[in-house]
Design a protein with these regions (language model features):
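Amphipathic alpha-helical packing segments from all-alpha helical-bundle domains
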Residues: 76, 80-81, 120-159, 168-173
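Solvent-exposed, amphipathic alpha-helical segments
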Residues: 19, 23-31, 78-82, 177-185
Length: 214
């Protein structure tokens, strides 16, 4: 099964929106907590006026959520394109884990996205996030990510790697597996995991994912 990944398939945001997305990325890579970031921080970093942000978004939560999704849509597109150079589904999954291991800064950004969606950010509470509807830019990026994952997992099914046919369950399985691996290598929780080598962690993560799909 052939797949053609083109990052330009994601709608290019207006220049000022792109600058805000880049500003959010830079702030989070600097170890800022989501709750500490203000709209003014974003616009100053982006080099635009504060009022400009509200021409495109209704809140800082909406800016951050869209920025994280757009960032990952682009990174995932490039990552899957690289992974598809491998013919074997398992090797493709390992390729993704290679990337996660080499790009821990993006793992931390994904942690922020996960916490926002799970409602775990509590200092201060970010209740407005749950009320945010997908914006034009973030929603298109979200749809693109879903399409990429669907095609990636369908190829695994065609290869006979698993038997699950439900696309939602496939998507949940691969995302859960990669989040699990990212947490293990990023947080470095301590002695409990020191008995496992990176090879053992990858094998365990992959094996558990396949079991959940059979």
């Amino acid at each position: 099964m052939e797949i053609e990944i083109k990052v330009e398939n994601i709608k290019n945001p207006p220049e000022k929106v792109r600058l805000m997305y880049e500003a959010v990325s830079q702030l989070l890579k600097g170890d800022r907590e989501l709750s500490s970031i203000k709209v003014q921080d974003i616009t100053q970093k982006a080099g635009i006026g504060k009022g400009t942000a509200y021409e495109y978004f209704s809140s800082k939560e909406e800016i951050i959520a869209n920025a994280l999704m757009f960032e990952y849509a682009n990174k995932i597109a490039l990552l899957v394109e690289s992974a598809f150079k491998e013919k074997d589904f398992k090797k493709r999954c390992y390729k993704i884990m290679d990337w996660l291991c080499e790009n821990k800064d993006y793992n931390m950004m994904f942690k922020h996205l996960f916490r926002m969606n799970a409602g775990l950010q509590a200092e201060p509470p970010m209740e407005k996030l749950e009320e945010c509807e997908p914006g034009n830019f973030g929603y298109e990026a979200y749809q693109y990510v879903c399409q990429i994952i669907d095609e990636f997992m369908e190829d695994g099914y065609v290869q006979g790697a698993f038997t699950e046919t439900d696309k939602r369950k496939r998507c949940l399985a691969i995302l859960t597996a990669m989040i699990q691996y990212a947490v293990l290598i990023t947080c470095q929780i301590g002695a409990h995991y020191e008995i496992m080598s990176d090879k053992e962690m990858r094998e365990a993560v992959y094996t558990n994912m396949i079991k959940s799909l059979n």
